[in-house]
């Protein structure tokens, strides 16, 4: 039976019920709905709606219901209830009779679902923080293992300057640390309790909402009942955080897909995160990474979905807001599995140091060093840049690296070039000169790694 049937003389059509009911989605809020109901029973006991005996009986029945259903979603969905709130109330009435009908006194599904959703976001958000920390640790471990492997750094997907593989790893550590910080901030803003604000105007019963909030683990209650039931900022913010983090995951996946390709051959992925072809026996496909990249789109879609849903709603609850959960749940599921999978990929990744070093020595990645050499000889940088560009064109025509041009050939571009030029054109010199904070010299990467390990 619906919770609102008294106003109506006709039953809902089967099509409307199918269209309107949210239980197949919001059954995932069973724990939060019951926990919130237990707290609400205590709150209305304190204002005289329930006796202590009645409160105890409701608490016992609600805890029994939680034990029966927490790991059995099929039992919830099979009930045919309109939503998770209806399911809990109907199940409670079946257990304790008319006493169960008292529980909703002073409460609306509007503040109830807002509370459920914030409780769920808080719980899932903490789990996501753990997964982000695990991925961060996996990157730090990989950076430590391969800290001095030399590889080409790219701009425009063209070899630009040599870097250390450890430097590449720590670049993504920075990104995922920002993701952690953003999610922590979002969870702080979500840490306010909606319960006790009613449908939109507040509850008519003089309960202690501060005490109620604390009993549910919130830092404080919300302060405006109208805003409270209108608000889905926490959903939007978490979906936004997930979208940024998935963008980072997708970029890392793209890098690794390229590094793993036959054209690069920089890394080897473990068999446990790859698959083969049904036709081509030789294939070993980076499916885990490609799926991370692919799932990013659905997370972006959910963010745009909830933003579009909320953009023109008048204040207080509107049924449009029922559409918040399906996207949120999918976002959190996708983000979670991608974080776990990324950490697994990194744990088994092997670097082919011979190939990365060979690639770093190609593509005239030491050209900037030659320009800096000329600057040290007194030439303005813009002029040095032009001179080196001409030298590179000549080297390309001769199909030889810059460092293999003869001194006479180099001096044809500038008389400032002397025999000591060859010392600055080595890979070792290119890396060692990047000594400023944040650079890719081995000492800087070691310092950065030590700092990250201290903060784990």
UniProtKB/Swiss-Prot annotation:
E.C. no: 4.3.2.1
Pfam families associated with the record: ASL_C2, Lyase_1
Catalytic activity: 2-(N(omega)-L-arginino)succinate = fumarate + L-arginine
Subcellular location: Cytoplasm
GO CC list: cytosol
A molecular-function term among this protein's GO annotations: argininosuccinate lyase activity
Domain of life from the UniProt record: Bacteria
Record flagged with keyword Transcription: no
InterPro entries per record: Arg_succ_lyase_C, Argininosuccinate_lyase, Fumarase/histidase_N, Fumarate_lyase_CS, Fumarate_lyase_fam, Fumarate_lyase_N, L-Aspartase-like
Primary location group: cytoplasm
Enzyme class: lyase
Pathway named in the protein's UniProt entry: Amino-acid biosynthesis; L-arginine biosynthesis; L-arginine from L-ornithine and carbamoyl phosphate: step 3/3
Keywords noted in UniProt: Amino-acid biosynthesis, Arginine biosynthesis, Cytoplasm, Lyase
Example GO BP: L-arginine biosynthetic process
Family under the similarity heading: Belongs to the lyase 1 family. Argininosuccinate lyase subfamily.
Stated name of the protein: Argininosuccinate lyase
Organism field: Shewanella pealeana (strain ATCC 700345 / ANG-SQ1)
């Amino acid at each position: 039976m619906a919770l609102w049937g008294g106003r109506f003389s006709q039953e809902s059509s089967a099509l409307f019920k199918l269209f309107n009911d949210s239980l197949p989605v919001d059954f995932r809020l069973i724990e939060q709905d019951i926990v919130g109901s237990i707290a609400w029973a205590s709150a209305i006991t304190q204002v005289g709606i329930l006796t202590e005996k009645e409160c105890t009986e409701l608490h016992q029945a609600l805890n029994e219901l939680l034990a029966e259903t927490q790991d059995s979603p099929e039992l919830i969905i099979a009930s045919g209830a309109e939503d998770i709130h209806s399911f809990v109330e109907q199940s409670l009435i079946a257990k304790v009779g008319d006493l169960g009908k008292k529980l909703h006194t002073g409460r609306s599904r509007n503040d109830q679902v807002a509370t459920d959703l914030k409780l769920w976001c808080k719980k899932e958000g903490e789990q996501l923080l753990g997964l982000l920390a695990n991925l961060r640790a996996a990157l730090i471990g990989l950076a430590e293992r391969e800290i001095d492997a030399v590889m080409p750094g790219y701009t425009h997907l063209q070899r630009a300057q040599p870097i250390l593989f450890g430097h590449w790893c720590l670049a993504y550590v920075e990104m995922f640390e920002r993701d952690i910080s953003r999610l922590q901030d979002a969870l702080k803003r979500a840490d306010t309790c909606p319960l006790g604000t009613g449908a939109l105007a507040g509850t008519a019963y003089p309960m202690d909402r501060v005490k109620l909030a604390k009993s549910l683990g919130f830092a404080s209650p919300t302060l405006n009942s109208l805003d409270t039931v209108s608000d889905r900022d926490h959903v939007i913010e978490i979906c936004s955080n997930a979208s940024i983090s998935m963008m980072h995951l997708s970029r890392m996946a793209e890098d690794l897909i390229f590094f793993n390709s036959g054209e690069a051959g920089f890394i080897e992925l473990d068999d446990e995160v790859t698959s083969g072809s049904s036709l081509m026996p030789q294939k070993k496909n980076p499916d885990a990474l490609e799926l991370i990249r692919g799932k990013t789109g659905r997370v972006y879609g959910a963010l745009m979905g909830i933003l579009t849903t909320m953009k023109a709603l008048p204040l207080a609850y509107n049924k449009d807001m029922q559409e918040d959960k399906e996207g949120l749940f999918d976002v959190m599921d996708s983000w979670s599995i991608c974080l776990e999978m990324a950490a697994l990929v990194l744990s088994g990744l092997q670097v082919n140091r011979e190939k990365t070093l060979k690639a770093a020595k190609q593509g005239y990645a030491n050209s900037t060093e030659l320009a800096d050499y000329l600057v040290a000889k007194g030439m303005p940088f813009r002029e040095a840049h032009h001179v080196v560009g001409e030298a590179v064109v000549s080297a390309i025509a001769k199909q030889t690296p810059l460092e293999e041009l003869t001194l006479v050939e180099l001096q044809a571009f500038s008389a400032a070039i002397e025999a000591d030029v060859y010392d600055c054109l080595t890979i070792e010199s290119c890396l060692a000169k990047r000594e400023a904070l944040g650079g890719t010299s081995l000492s800087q990467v070691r310092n950065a790694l030590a700092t990250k390990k201290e903060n784990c």
